[in-house]
Amino acid sequence: MKQVQTKRDWKKLAYDVVEEKMITKEDAIAILEADDTEVLEIMNAAYIIRHHYFGKKVKLNMIINTKSGLCPEDCGYCSQSIISEAPIDKYAWLTQEKIVEGAHEAIRRKAGTYCIVASGRRPTDKEVNHVIGAVKEIRETTDLKICCCLGFLNEDQAGRLAEAGVHRYNHNLNTHANNYESICSTHTYDDRVDTVQKAKQAGISPCSGAIFGMGETIEERAEIAFELQRIDADSIPCNFLVAVKGTPLEGQKELTPVECLKVLAMMRFVNPTKEIRISGGREINLRSVQPIGLFAANSIFVGDYLTTAGQEPTADWGMIEDLGFEIEECAL
């Protein structure tokens, strides 16, 4: 007689997490390896944790790409890298006025956090000053929380951004340490961890996540979540690879919608109190199951991404309302 495999009690695991019992790496791998028919049970369990810590609130974030392309790094997934042949817009820094205008557009889109992003390995001191000028005006004229993503930072730059009023700094780990050399050769995994730590030491809330679907194993996928727990990232963007034509990862098989849901649920189980954001690839990879993702995640980007299009803000507002959730405005 064929032995029937007993399914996991996902709800019990969720209640254990709510009672502050940490799950194991084996538990995380079990979520990722669960049969696709269990995904709704897993998402229901993830929602127990999500609701316990965040209720029905959804945080909206908006990106402005203040400097596009022209990056000397060779990250294989990125359309802005020096080795990319993707047909993207390339431009130097936007003016401070344009950056400030973007902040007011973020408010119109009901975003609470405004993310100032620039391509490149690391900013010069002059470029940091350029951002600081815009940040100060935004702080004086809005209640927005400000996140910056400018590349590697030194201690002085991190301190000056903190003093200017930057609330959060994004620097993703991107992939597992074991997989990093296959993705990028111009800097190391440890370089990325170092910048996250410098931002945190300066008093800036650390935002760090990963891009899933870049050849990492299931075990590595789970270990990424625990590494983000270790570095104590307050906000965790879960990106799903969009295999952009003209990049080295063109043709890479993208994750299925169900695989993406399992990643989001696993990340919620491992990092129960953290902001989990469905980020790049949301519309392309999750497709029609986007709303289900919010049963694990509590944050999304509204509008376009760096070089790929998002959906209309009204579609995101409607999705949140249809779920019975609420937009948390002006919240970090």
Curated annotation (Swiss-Prot):
Key word S-adenosyl-L-methionine present? yes
Q: Which family does it belong to?
A: Belongs to the radical SAM superfamily. Biotin synthase family.
- Main EC class of this protein? transferase
Q: What is its EC number?
A: 2.8.1.6
Cofactor detail note:
Binds 1 [4Fe-4S] cluster. The cluster is coordinated with 3 cysteines and an exchangeable S-adenosyl-L-methionine.
Which pathway? Cofactor biosynthesis; biotin biosynthesis; biotin from 7,8-diaminononanoate: step 2/2
Q: Return the Pfam families for the record.
A: BATS, Radical_SAM
**Single GO BP term:** biotin biosynthetic process
What this protein needs as a cofactor is: [4Fe-4S] cluster; [2Fe-2S] cluster
Question: Which keywords are on file for this protein?
Answer: 2Fe-2S, 4Fe-4S, Biotin biosynthesis, Iron, Iron-sulfur, Metal-binding, S-adenosyl-L-methionine, Transferase
> Briefly, what is this protein's role?
Catalyzes the conversion of dethiobiotin (DTB) to biotin by the insertion of a sulfur atom into dethiobiotin via a radical-based mechanism.
Per UniProt, [4Fe-4S] cluster binds at 71, 75, 78
What lineage, starting at the top, does this entry show?
A: Bacteria, Bacillati, Bacillota, Bacilli, Bacillales
Binding of [2Fe-2S] cluster, residues: 115, 147, 207, 277
User: What chemistry does it catalyse, as a reaction equation?
Assistant: (4R,5S)-dethiobiotin + (sulfur carrier)-SH + 2 reduced [2Fe-2S]-[ferredoxin] + 2 S-adenosyl-L-methionine = (sulfur carrier)-H + biotin + 2 5'-deoxyadenosine + 2 L-methionine + 2 oxidized [2Fe-2S]-[ferredoxin]
Q: Please state every residue range assigned to the domain named Radical SAM core.
A: 53-282
SUBUNIT field? Homodimer.
Q: Which InterPro entries match?
A: Aldolase_TIM, BATS_dom, Biotin_synth/BioAB, Biotin_synthase, Elp3/MiaA/NifB-like_rSAM, rSAM
Name used for this protein in its record: Biotin synthase
One GO MF term, please?
A: 2 iron, 2 sulfur cluster binding
